[in-house]
Swiss-Prot record:
Name the UniProt record assigns to this protein: Shikimate dehydrogenase (NADP(+))
Pathway: Metabolic intermediate biosynthesis; chorismate biosynthesis; chorismate from D-erythrose 4-phosphate and phosphoenolpyruvate: step 4/7
Reactions catalysed: shikimate + NADP(+) = 3-dehydroshikimate + NADPH + H(+)
Residues annotated as signal peptide: none
Organism: Pyrococcus furiosus (strain ATCC 43587 / DSM 3638 / JCM 8422 / Vc1)
High-level lineage: Archaea, Methanobacteriati, Methanobacteriota, Thermococci, Thermococcales
Amino acid sequence: MINGETKIYGIIGNPVKHSLSPIMHNALFKKFGINAIYVPFEVKKDLKNAINGVKALDIQGVNVTMPYKEEVIKFLDELSEDSQNIGSVNTVVNLEGKLVGYTTDGIGARRALERFTQVDGANILILGAGGAGKAIAYELSKVANVVVLNRTIEKAKRLEKFGIVGDSLEALPYYVEWADILINATSVGMNEEKSLVPKNLLRPGLVVMDIVYKPLNTLLLRYAQEKGCIAIDGLWMLVYQGAESFRLWTGEEGDVELMRRVALAWLRERK
C-alpha cells in the first residue's frame, strides 16, 4: 500500500511506455516486502531538469534507457569505474542526494549468455557501439575475444583501448564466420521485420542473442532458429541487468525467474 514512507524508483527514457521494467521491479518489491514503487518517466527533452527532479523529489534510483545512456553522465555526481571507462550509464543510485551512475547492461548480457553457453575464451561478435553495445563489449572483453561492428566505424574503433577490435558493418560476413557468439546490440528489429544479419550467414551451433525484446522473437532470432543456432531473446538480458540494478538499490538479489515470468505474462496479455 502506497503511503508517506513509500520509496520511489523509475525509468527515464523516450519512449518508455513499452518498458517491462515497472512490471519486473514492482513484482520484486512485493516479493521482498519492500515499501516501494517503480514507475516510468517519459522524458521527451530537458534531461537535466529530469535528473534534478530525481534529487529534489528524493527518488531513490532510476534506470536510464535510450536515448539518454550517454547524455545522462554530465548530470551525475559520481560514476562507477565501468561507467567511467565506457561512457554509458543505465542505473542511477541516489545516495542521500549524491547521484551515482552504474552500468548493468554488460553484466546482464554476460549472465544471460552464461545461462546458455561458455563465455570464457569465446569469440564474440557484437553489432552496435551505442550505450548498450559498449557496455556489453567492455564486460565481455574481460573474459573473451570481442569484435564490435558499427555503421560509424569511429565509434567502434574507440573501444580498441580495451583490447576490443572495432570495424565496419561491411565486414559482417568475415566476422560471423569467426564468431562463436553473435549479439545484436542495436535497435534494429524493434517493432519491425528487419535483421542486420542475413539468414545465409548463420550456421548450426552459433549462439545468437538479440537485446531487442519487443517482439520477443525477432526476425534475427527466427533466422537463427531456422539455421539451427542457439537463440537467446532480449528478455534474458533485461531480467539479469534489472536484477543487478535491484541489488544496487536494495542490497537484495533479484529473482530473475520471477522477473521473466511476470514479464512474459504481461507480453502475452498484450499480444
